[in-house]
Amino acid sequence: MAVTTPDWLKQREGELQVHKDGRSGSVYFAGQLQYVLMPMPAKGKFACRISETINGRRLDGDGIYPTNEDALRGGLEELRAKLGW
């Protein structure tokens, strides 16, 4: 199953664009790139690195996920929580 833009992001006029490699994604608000999510190997599974593009600040959570897709979905949820939504 492909990773799609979650409802909470759509409600705020945001968009997820999964990169052509299918392994990472970018979050846009009002057409402007705001965050990059990149699943990374962690403890034999995957974690998600979340970077704010305007200043490079990292917003990573501590979730570990079984697959790359799950890490991308989990990273979106971690981002939602960090943003207080």
Model-predicted regions and their roles:
Residues 3, 36-38, 63:
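Compositionally biased, intrinsically disordered/low-complexity regions enriched for serine, proline
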Residues 53-54, 72, 76:
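Short, charge-rich amphipathic interface segments used for partner binding and complex assembly
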Residues 33-59:
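A short, structured beta-strand/loop element
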